[in-house]
Amino acid sequence: MSNAIATDAGMAWKTGPIRPRACTCGSVICHLLHERVMTDMSRRMFVGGVAAMMAPFTGLYAAEPGPAGTPKQADRPILLTNLRLFDGTGKPVRQGVQVLIQGKLITALPAAAEKVEGAQVIDCQGKLVMPGLIDTHWHTMLAAIPQMTAMTADLGYLYLSAAQEAQRTLMRGFTSVRDAGGPAFALKRAIDEGMVVGPRIYPSGAMISQTSGHGDFRLRSDIPRAANEPLSQVELTGVAMIADGETEVLRRVREQLMLGASQIKMLAGGGVASLYDPLDSTQFTEKELRAGVEAAGDWNTYVMAHVYTPKGIKRAIKAGVKSIEHGQLADEESVKMMRDEGVWWSLQPFLQDEDSNVYPDPARRESQSKVAQGTVKAYELAQKYGIKTGWGTDVLFNPKGTATQGRQLAKLTRFYDPLTLLKQATSTNAELLALSGERNPYPQPLGRIAPGAYADLLVADGDPAVNLDFLSNPEQNLRLIMKDGKVHKNTL
């Protein structure tokens, strides 16, 4: 691989030593979660009971009423002044502007000298103002649950834990996430209604998997399952649904759409963390994948597909899938097919370093190594052929790993110049989210600082023209965090 994959502004971004990391979407640990999560409560019961569980969080961030005869703080426009602006487009940081916010939206970018009557002024002290970050492959409900907790905790604790992690996610500067599988619907609702604090969630609902596929977390002792037998615990929980044949695929996809999925996640190939499906396996027939694509298309949204191999990638594209998740083993033919069909490539930094998962068995370590070697090539091919590329992390069952979210973005400057990479994690990722079309739960523009966009903003100590290292330590370097025009952190 070239030592200068990206050369914007004549800068060479050299590759360092790469060690492998791999996808964690299909760990068998999910089975442990299933056994505990829904033992005494169905998903419908949870939807009804989440309000009670989240009640202690309600109102923590409510605006204080103003003095008599004056507007409440929340009713006043907010004016950010004295700043350096990265607007999300990838253009260089600029000065000489302010950011005016009214309610949930950015309303204008007035000149630096312009006064705004009645506005609440926030002096940014010459620091960087940028859009909130977006992670397009995040597991909201499953990222921060360790194995022992999954084995021993009751349902209430698990969902309270997910709510706390949602708040931490926001405090790392991530104002939006695309959930890549799991029962996130109720948590999304609680966040939207202000019951808890967290990022915007684009939910996929349960991952759709074939029998023996990447989302089949049953034990071998559970096999075979007769047609009239009840669903497994993982299915009842809403982590994954098993579907074989076009009819079952249609049913399971339609169920997730009914529950509120903004897009559908189908598992079209093997993985590393899962025990039963080899990395090289191809999953779902083209007809089965097409059935899911058509069901999603009838609801004016799309299918994202977990897949690694060229064969699986090409099959998914032929079926109409719009976003390839992972794809680190892609070859030039399959990448050209992505380009020609306008398919997105949602890549993750699967590099075995301090942020990677540790596997005890040699088989999975070997698969992990193959994926990591492919990661380097994948970033090279994505740029060579101009593929629309999203960025995400895919942290799963790793409480310590969730804290690395920003660092996993920052370290990718070995593949991209920092401004291009920051654009990828803001406005480019927002374009990927917008593929949800009519099912988009947040229809205003995201990932940009422009009039009409959601007021999701960060004020940071850092210079994206040099590097993104400041995102590795959000507690120290993110001085202000705003979502929906509401300030959740201010240490200016």
How should these model regions be labeled?
Residues 153, 298, 373-464:
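His/Asp/Glu-enriched, well-ordered alpha-helical/loop segment
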Residues 64-72, 76-78, 85, 89-130:
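Histidine-rich, glycine-flanked metal-binding segment
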Residues 183, 192-315:
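Histidine/acidic-residue-rich, glycine-tolerant segments that coordinate divalent metal ions
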Residues 127-193, 211-220, 287, 319:
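Metal-associated gating/positioning segment near the N- to mid-region
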Residues 83, 438-440, 445-492:
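C-terminal cap of metal-dependent C-N hydrolases
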Residues 1-45, 50-56:
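N-terminal secretory signal peptides
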Residues 161-187, 198-207, 261-274, 302, ...:
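Divalent metal-dependent hydrolysis catalytic cores, especially in the metallo-beta-lactamase
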Residues 211, 267-377, 384, 388-390, ...:
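Active-site core of metal-dependent hydrolases
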